[in-house]
């Protein structure tokens, strides 16, 4: 049986979207600890510098307006996107705030003087294992460790951008790794392979 796990860097669009949503939640709770937030973020690169749409439902008491959303989005992007990333430019980026008040049906169903409902929110559970020092499953542990090392390289190499993905497959005769990262147009594929082999997979004795 083959097992595959993948992790994405903080510069991957999925992670950036999660970060923006997390910032919205943090801001809402700081404004009022009883705020209810169900927020989703969509972003895409464009020829005019990028588009970010923040939507979902949020309590009125959270008090986050268009200017607040704009600041949240730009703060998050400033931490996760390099200036060389052509599809996103903070000075020309379009930001849409599509947050709406929480529906009365949901509010009345989850708010009670004695019982506090969770709405449609859930908690994902996993398991711990003594196979690794992190107590995470080996496939995920390897993928995450390589991604963390790659993130350090990306932040110090001007030829690399911050969007990347690492996929690790175990269960066969050998562990296999696929590393994908955005980069400048002029970088050579052999140079990328050398970086991957020397700094990422060689120390862990994995095949590329």
Placement of each model-derived feature along the sequence:
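Flexible, glycine/charged-enriched surface loops at secondary-structure junctions
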Residues: 32-40, 83-93, 152-169, 200
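Residues forming anionic-ligand binding surfaces in small-molecule and nucleic-acid pockets
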Residues: 3-4, 115-133
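Loop-centered beta-sheet repeat module
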Residues: 161-164, 172-197
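N-terminal, positively charged regions that mediate nucleic acid binding
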Residues: 1-35
């Amino acid at each position: 049986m083959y097992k595959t796990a993948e992790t994405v860097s903080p510069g991957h669009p999925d992670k950036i979207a999660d970060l923006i949503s997390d910032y919205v939640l943090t801001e809402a709770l700081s404004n009022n600890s009883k705020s209810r937030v169900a927020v989703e973020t969509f972003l895409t690169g464009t020829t005019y510098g990028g588009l970010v749409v923040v939507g979902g439902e949020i309590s009125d008491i959270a008090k986050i307006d268009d200017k607040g959303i704009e600041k949240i989005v730009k703060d998050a992007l400033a931490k996760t996107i390099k200036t060389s990333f052509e599809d996103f430019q903070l000075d020309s980026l379009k930001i849409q705030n599509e947050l709406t008040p929480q529906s009365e049906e949901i509010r009345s169903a989850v708010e009670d003087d004695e019982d506090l409902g969770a709405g449609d929110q859930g908690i994902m559970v996993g398991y711990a294992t003594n196979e690794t020092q992190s107590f995470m499953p080996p496939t995920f542990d390897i993928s995450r460790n390589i991604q963390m090392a790659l993130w350090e390289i990306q932040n110090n190499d001007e030829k690399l951008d911050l969007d990347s993905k690492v996929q690790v497959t175990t269960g066969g005769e050998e562990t296999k790794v696929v590393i994908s990262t955005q980069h400048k147009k002029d970088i050579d594929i052999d140079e990328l392979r050398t970086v991957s082999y020397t700094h990422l997979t060689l120390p862990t004795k994995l095949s590329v």
